[in-house]
A protein has these predicted regions:
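N-terminal core-binding DNA-recognition domain of tyrosine recombinases/integrases
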Residues: 29-131, 258
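DNA breakage-rejoining catalytic core of tyrosine-based enzymes
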Residues: 113-115, 127-143, 195-206, 222-226
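Short, polar N-cap/turn motifs at the start of nucleic acid-interacting alpha helices
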Residues: 181-183, 260-261, 280-299
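Basic, Lys/Arg- and aromatic-enriched nucleic-acid-binding interface segment
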Residues: 129, 138-170
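DNA/chromatin major-groove-contacting recognition/catalytic segments
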Residues: 4-5, 299, 303-318
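Active-site/catalytic core of tyrosine-dependent DNA strand-transfer enzymes
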Residues: 204-259
């Protein structure tokens, strides 16, 4: 059964943003410089930017256009409580809290504040997943292969099988450039992953063929992709494809194979689980996923084999 998505809260208003406390906007500009120096991905910066601007508009609307330097723990808790009342689920709430916390960490680093007002605000405990986790079977992967071939969009083929066989996170996939490919060894190098890790994303022989077909197609059509692997009408030399666009592609692929809740992260879950079913050990799967340890892999990425557990229990007579 699908889990209902968190209600989308959109405070963004161009006119109100012009009225936001100028000090807040200047601090945000400084934060942008800091994020640029740290070489955060464009999508990460975009996420922080959206979260912080929505908060600034709340400060303008509900809290007398308060400066973030003067906001107290109570002021910020009021914002979190308001979001919860509007329908945010735990996962979305945690992301907003993380964005504001990171901003205050920057302000403290720059000695603009002595204490962070969010330091002692507890994060909500683990809640329901934003969307259902889908574990694709070998049969569904084969069906996906057939349906995509029939559909005839080579970019969609390349995306699906690169995401699946590389097990890369959506943000890493979105930011891939052709210059990062080692064709002989079949991997993308110097890939920026979660928490600033630099990793390799290896891919299958089948994926290599799709990527080569994609290059040939663009050359024949005279399409300038600005060096990015994946392309949409909104991609520019400095702006990669948006994560939301990749998620839309996932929905399209999911609809083809009878999995309407399919989303980007499901490719990671699915390939990890398929590897497990083929006898690959947990440590190797964890390394493929670029996890720091096996705990996360086991808890969040591998589907529990309840049938095997029942068989073990039935084999013991007490």
């Amino acid at each position: 059964m699908a889990v209902e998505r968190s209600k989308r809260i959109n405070l963004y208003d161009e006119e109100k943003l012009k009225q936001v406390n100028p000090e807040n906007m200047k601090l945000l500009e400084k934060y942008h410089i800091d994020m640029s120096i740290r070489d955060l991905s464009p999508n990460t910066v975009y996420g922080y930017n959206v979260d912080l601007k929505q908060w600034f508009i709340f400060l303008y609307d509900k809290q007398f256009n308060l400066s973030v330097l003067e906001a107290t723990e109570d002021d910020i808790e009021e914002y979190y409580f308001w979001r919860k009342q509007q329908g945010n689920n735990v996962n979305r709430q945690k992301r907003v809290m993380a964005s504001i916390s990171a901003f205050y960490k920057f302000l403290r680093k720059k000695k603009l504040i002595t204490e962070s007002p969010v330091e002692f605000i507890d994060r909500p405990k683990e809640g329901q997943a934003v969307v259902t986790q889908t574990y694709l079977t070998k049969e569904e992967v084969q069906l996906m292969r057939e349906k995509l071939e029939e559909y005839g969009d080579v970019q969609l083929q390349a995306y699906a099988f690169l995401s699946l066989t590389s097990m890369g996170r959506v943000n890493a996939i979105a930011n891939l450039k052709w210059s990062q490919i080692n064709w002989d060894e079949r991997f993308f190098g110097d890939v920026l992953e979660k928490e600033g890790k630099i990793v390799e994303l290896s891919f299958s022989l089948e994926t290599k063929e799709y990527l080569q077909k994609l290059i040939k197609y663009r050359e024949e059509k005279g399409i300038d992709d600005y060096g990015w692997v994946f392309l949409s009408p909104y991609v520019t030399p400095d702006k990669p494809i948006n994560n939301g666009t990749l998620n839309d592609w996932c929905k399209k692929i999911g609809a083809m194979i009878g999995q309407p809740t399919l989303h980007c992260h499901d490719f990671r879950h699915s390939y990890a689980n398929l590897m497990k079913s083929e006898g690959v050990n947990l440590e190797d799967i964890s390394t493929m996923l670029n996890h720091s340890g096996t705990d996360v892999t086991k808890k969040h990425y591998l589907k529990q084999d309840t049938k095997k557990i029942r068989e073990i229990k039935d084999s013991i007579s007490i």
